[in-house]
């Protein structure tokens, strides 16, 4: 546990040193944990492996592996990716690409469960929290059923492409 805390502090120092998170300047601290973290100064990347968890402004990202690139200011999360937004919605995927403020997320095979029990599934999603999000191969149902375990809702809405405007 002490090692994990050390690595967490080390990763925070690396992120702060690199200027990886503009959110730090906005007073939105990022909490970061992983079993192992390696930094490559030559290509400006960081690799976090095992029980990776990042928290910021009421949002949480967990994954098996997260790769961060300083130049692109993007993180790629792979394996058992779970993103919980500030409203409590749970979004799962095998892979997500995120900016450091969690305001732009690209995901493949997205499965979302909302606090009211409804669910949303998409083959892919380009999510922008402050503008228009686009989803391909989407499906929505207000049914509070276990869709991930194969339960089928009585009805659902399906679309080849869905656009969501936050306004």
What are these regions (language model features)?
Residues 1-4:
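N-terminal secretory signal peptides that target proteins for export/translocation
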Residues 25-167:
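Structural signature for solvent-exposed beta-strand/loop edge elements and short helix-capping sites
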Residues 8-19:
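Bacterial N-terminal signal peptides
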């Amino acid at each position: 546990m002490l090692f994990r805390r050390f690595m967490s502090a080390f990763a925070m120092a690396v992120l702060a040193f690199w200027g990886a998170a503009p959110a730090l300047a906005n007073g939105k601290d990022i909490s970061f944990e992983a079993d192992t973290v390696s930094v490559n100064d030559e290509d400006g990347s960081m690799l976090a492996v095992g029980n990776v968890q990042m928290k910021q402004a009421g949002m949480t990202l967990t994954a098996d592996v997260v790769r961060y690139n300083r130049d692109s200011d993007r993180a790629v999360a792979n394996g058992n990716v779970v993103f919980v937004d500030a409203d409590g919605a749970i979004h799962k995927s095998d892979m997500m690409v995120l900016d450091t403020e969690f305001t732009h997320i690209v995901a493949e095979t997205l499965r979302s469960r909302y606090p009211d029990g409804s669910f949303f599934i998409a083959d892919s999603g380009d999510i922008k929290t402050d503008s228009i999000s686009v989803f391909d191969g989407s499906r929505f149902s207000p049914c509070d059923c276990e869709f991930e375990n194969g339960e089928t809702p009585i009805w659902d809405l399906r679309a080849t492409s869905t656009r969501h405007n936050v306004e």
